[in-house]
Regions:
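Residues marking helix boundaries in flexible regions
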Residues: 96, 100, 182-185, 200
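Hydrophobic, low-acid, alpha-helix-prone terminal segments
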Residues: 173-176, 180, 184-195
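Sequence-pattern detector for short linear motifs
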Residues: 119, 165, 180-182, 190, ...
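Hydrophobic alpha-helical and helix-loop surface patches within well-folded domains
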Residues: 1-170, 177
Length: 201
């Protein structure tokens, strides 16, 4: 069952932006049927496996199955900006945040867990490949149905789905440690020019 706030039960005409927000919100809550209910994170440090996936899939579904085909543009101007702003604060944290007790969870229902995590998932789609990404997600859901999962479980199913590509998602620093889900602040690229005028990243 999904409940909805009164603010989304419109009694008069609303702006297209507000109607789109309702669609994304309803789809976000429906996504929790899979990401949160069907498969639940093992511990709160992986809260993003619920919230980032719900944010990502709700935006994807809005863009591909509703009249709001520019939902990713809306995401970039709203949610992604929210994440970038929060990532500049002294209170920022990694997407996979250290959670020592339940009191630590309260600060993680924020732009990092929702929007930055969803942005990382969108990057993973391009990194793994769309078809292989969704094959991996399907396997992740089926392998952990009605049970718990971790980031390592997710990466293992994505790694299996992307074979025979070289390398390992589990060990690439772009994803763990100082990378996308383990780092704070947004990533910066440094460009250096050598004596021959070649640019290096």
């Amino acid at each position: 069952m999904v409940t909805i706030r009164d603010q989304y039960v419109f009694e008069s005409k609303v702006t297209d932006a507000y109607a789109e927000r309702r669609v994304v919100t309803v789809l976000h809550e429906l996504a929790h049927m899979w990401f949160g209910d069907y498969v639940t994170m093992t511990w709160w440090n992986d809260l993003w496996l619920n919230e980032s996936f719900a944010e990502f899939t709700s935006t994807l579904a809005t863009a591909e199955a509703t009249e709001w085909k520019d939902a990713w543009a809306t995401f970039s101007s709203g949610e992604k900006s929210w994440a970038l702003n929060q990532d500049q604060l002294s209170t920022t944290h990694p997407i996979v945040a250290p959670i020592n007790d339940l009191n630590d969870t309260y600060v993680n229902f924020d732009g990092i867990t929702y929007a930055k995590g969803a942005s990382v998932l969108k990057q993973l789609v391009y990194y793994v490949g769309r078809e292989k990404f969704f094959t991996g997600i399907n396997n992740y859901l089926n392998n952990h149905a009605y049970s718990n999962a971790t980031l390592a479980d997710l990466l293992a199913t994505l790694e299996e789905a992307r074979q025979p590509l070289p390398g390992s998602l589990l060990h690439e620093h772009e994803l763990l440690g100082d990378g996308l889900v383990g780092a704070v602040f947004h990533r910066l690229l440094q460009l250096l020019e050598d004596v021959d005028g070649h640019i290096h990243v």
